[in-house]
Regions:
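Bacterial N-terminal signal peptides
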Residues: 1-2
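Short glycine/proline- and aromatic-enriched beta-strand/turn motifs that initiate or cap beta-hairpins
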Residues: 5-54, 146, 150-154
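Short loop/turn motifs that connect adjacent beta-strands in outer-membrane beta-barrel proteins
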Residues: 7-18, 53-59, 94, 120-127, ...
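Glycine/serine-rich loop-strand microenvironments at binding/catalytic pocket rims
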Residues: 7-8, 14-24, 79-104, 151-155
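Transmembrane beta-strand segments that form the barrel wall of outer-membrane beta-barrel proteins
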Residues: 21-34, 60-71, 94-106, 126-137
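Solvent-exposed loop/turn segments connecting transmembrane beta-strands
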Residues: 34-43, 71-79, 100-112, 136-146
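Feature captures outer-membrane beta-barrel proteins of Gram-negative bacteria and organelles
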Residues: 45-55, 79-91, 109-129, 145-155
Length: 155
């Protein structure tokens, strides 16, 4: 048949395991009385690394660990380690909505909704940007909600 071309459109096999590495910058955190901005009196950065177990094109489970590093008055230190498991709701065009539980070694806990967008996709690697709204409670401190931006690589 003229114009007919055979196509090999094999669907990806699931489950799949993917890893990632990223850098997360908190922008601001709001508690009952104040807004604390990153980069003003101190600088805080998180370095999330994790594994995603993808069940299908639409859903997966993620296991993440993220050390928190704070630089203040010329001193830097790791202030906590975040255990951040969650469910991934994958959409079309590289968009993912993640719902994560948060357990920090400093005694805080909470939830983190995350909107993630793949911005560059290659055969073996993709680069993403994400925005998150972490809500934290516990450790005899007022509840907080923040906003953060994350840049990373999936492999």
């Amino acid at each position: 048949i003229r114009g007919a071309v055979a196509q090999n459109t094999t669907a990806p096999a699931y489950p799949q395991i993917k890893g990632y590495f990223s850098v997360l910058h908190p922008i601001a955190t709001l508690d009952q009385d104040t807004v604390v901005y990153n980069f003003v009196d101190s600088y805080t950065v998180l370095v999330p690394v994790g594994l995603n177990l993808l069940k299908s094109d639409h859903i997966g489970f993620s296991f993440e660990l993220a050390p928190t590093i704070k630089v203040e008055n010329g001193q830097d230190r790791v202030t906590s380690l975040l255990f951040h498991p969650g469910i991934l709701f994958r959409r079309n065009h590289g968009v993912t909505f993640a719902t994560r539980l948060a357990f920090e070694t400093n005694g805080r806990y909470g939830i983190t909704p995350i909107f993630n967008q793949v911005v560059v996709k290659r055969t073996d690697v993709s680069y993403f940007v994400a925005g998150s709204l972490p809500a934290r409670f516990g450790n005899n401190k007022p509840g907080t909600i923040g906003i953060a931006v994350q840049l990373g690589v999936n492999f």
